[in-house]
Amino acid sequence: MSSQSHIPYAVRASRHSNPLARQLFQIAEEKKSNVVVSADVTTSKELLDLADRLGPYITVLKTHIDILTDLSPTTLTSLKSLASKHRFLLFEDRKFVDIGSTVQKQYHGGSLRISEWAHIVNCAMLAGPGIVDALAQTASTPEFRSVYANEVEGGRALLILAEMTSKGSMATGAYTQLSVEAARRHRAFVLGFVATRALNDVLPVSTVDGDEEDFVVFTTGVSLSASGDALGQQYQTPTSAVERGADFIISGRGIYAAEDPLEAVLRYREEGWKAYLERVKGWKA
């Protein structure tokens, strides 16, 4: 895969064919932030409080909405309002991993109503490429696009889980290659990958149908203090993640569980942005 990580966000925004990618890069440039907060909290109050306090300093808020013990329609309405107020995107870390017809119903329908509020979702490739085909099919229908593919809603997009940061992960080799192949078939809907690095060595190519590809890389497991935990999570620092090709760095406990989450998010923003500027400083048009 051809990485564009050496190019500034503003330039990538001006060139990108995916509307949500353009918006994402624009937000990052405006806020001088490449931080994604993984808000793995269990009550609506905690989630909405974090969204309101940290929203001005982040590009994306990542949720596991099904771990909320008191989820209600009001929670989702309030979350959307805060995303609009503070200009950040919502990423539901659902990791769809079922047959196509099932994930279509999980995404666009069901009790969580994910497509109605999440700008970004993700999937794993364990069920095969049909899962990406199915989600892209749903997102391409005239009915879906008329509701969500507009400036107010901001569009919808998919990240493919190409690699994981947990020790012993099987998301390697042929699995990662399959992820890239699936993304290339649906470039209008696939924003990029959740990966530990830029995937330059996976099916290298510079253009697709004459158009230079630019998949966005989100890296999880970013921490300023820890190297791992008792459950096999392996961490990178903001600097090392960006140096390895991360466009956006995802941190959870390092921010939301900090004594002062606001102070923590500012530290992550400062280090992540400094690493980004160092990465693109040699770029010339």
Curated annotation (Swiss-Prot):
Pathway: Pyrimidine metabolism; UMP biosynthesis via de novo pathway; UMP from orotate: step 2/2. The keyword Lyase applies. GO terms for molecular function: orotidine-5'-phosphate decarboxylase activity. It comes from the Eukaryota. The active site is at residue 95. Keywords: Decarboxylase, Lyase, Pyrimidine biosynthesis. Substrate binds at residues 40, 62-64, 93-102, 235, 253. Its EC number is 4.1.1.23. Pfam families: OMPdecase (PF00215). InterPro entries: Aldolase_TIM, OMPdecase, OMPdecase_AS, OMPdeCOase_dom, RibuloseP-bd_barrel. GO terms for cellular component: cytosol. GO terms for biological process: 'de novo' pyrimidine nucleobase biosynthetic process; 'de novo' UMP biosynthetic process. It catalyses: orotidine 5'-phosphate + H(+) = UMP + CO2. The keyword Lyase applies. PANTHER family: OROTIDINE 5'-PHOSPHATE DECARBOXYLASE. Belongs to the OMP decarboxylase family. This is Orotidine 5'-phosphate decarboxylase. It comes from Paracoccidioides brasiliensis.
